[in-house]
Amino acid sequence: FLQNLMGINILSAGFMTGSTANLIALAFIFSMAGTKVYYTDWMFANLPVVLTAMFISWLIGPKLLFRLTNKEKQPAIKGGIDVLKKQLDAMGKFSALEKKGAVIFGIVVLMWVTDRFHFGLFGFEINAVMAAIIGGVIALLPRVGILKWNEADIPWHLMLFSAGAYAGGLALNDTGAATWAVQSLFKAINFDKHINFWVLYTVIIAVMMYSHFVFTSKTMRTIILIPFIIALAKELGINPLALALPAAFTIDWVIGLPISAKPNVILFTAGQYSVLDNLKYGFIISTIGIILLLIAGMTWFKFLGITP
């Protein structure tokens, strides 16, 4: 169950559509730093880090921290595979609605992956949010769609929260509050503006990574920290992308506590592990994630032109 928790959260970090908070972070980078990050930019940069982290977590978790006894390795349900096969067969073949759903999902993913080519092909760009909206509209169209309007459950409260959070983050930049906070911090701690880039990079990644132990909302972490990081980079004369994008890569690493994300809560209710187990495993893998992002920053991200 803990390995499922790692997989769900860490693998979602490999894609910018893994969470709304990722998109908000990219919107800050574009509006405050003027740098556009495309779907494939994020995927090519962070997916190798994520896959490496997953492999290491598989070695550390089941192989070292939570070794299974021979008895535990045996199937918990007698004939479990046969039961699953029967349930799968009972579902029958793909229905017309399921095929439509797969096609609509494929269209949305295609729009996401090809976002950098839209302007050249169509004269305008379909960003990740618009692609999702288009998919939703298609799903609700008569005959073509798979849902009726009265069946759609739109979480307006989440949309309003995300919009308000984004507006709040932009206000930090537009009012100069983020820059003022950075300058005040420099004066208060007598900060050396000539600090080594990699020292600063490591501190920022660590703060972003470990902050999920304090802030349970990914969106809240994003609107508090990403504008501050961009303002910090500007104040030091560093390309904001070099600090803000790697920091954004940590947003979905909410693996330390059962309350850190909805999937964590669902998995915890199965009663297969304790809060301490989750905390211990999450802290270890989070620390490994910081190390991996540091190594990637010095090698892979540098090759991609993200870090100097």
Predicted regions and their residues:
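Juxtamembrane and boundary regions of transmembrane helices in multi-pass small-molecule transporters
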Residues: L2-N4, S12-I24, S31-K93, K100-V103, ...
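Small-residue-rich segments of transmembrane alpha-helices in multi-pass membrane proteins
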Residues: I10, G80-K86, G135, L158-L172, ...
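Short helix-coil transition sites and intra-membrane helix breaks within transmembrane domains
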Residues: L11-A21, A171-A178, S211-I224, W253-K262
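Hydrophobic mid-bilayer segments of alpha-helices in multi-pass membrane transport proteins
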Residues: V50-F55, L97-V108, G123-P142, P155-A167, ...
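Flexible hinge motifs at transmembrane-helix junctions and intramembrane kinks/re-entrant loops
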Residues: L59-R67, G92-K99, V108-I154, L236-N239
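Structural signature of hydrophobic alpha-helical transmembrane segments
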Residues: F124-G136, A188-L200, L241-L257
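Core transmembrane alpha-helical segments of multi-pass membrane transporters/permeases
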Residues: W149-Q183, F197-Y210
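Hydrophobic alpha-helical transmembrane segments of multi-pass integral membrane proteins
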Residues: D192-A248
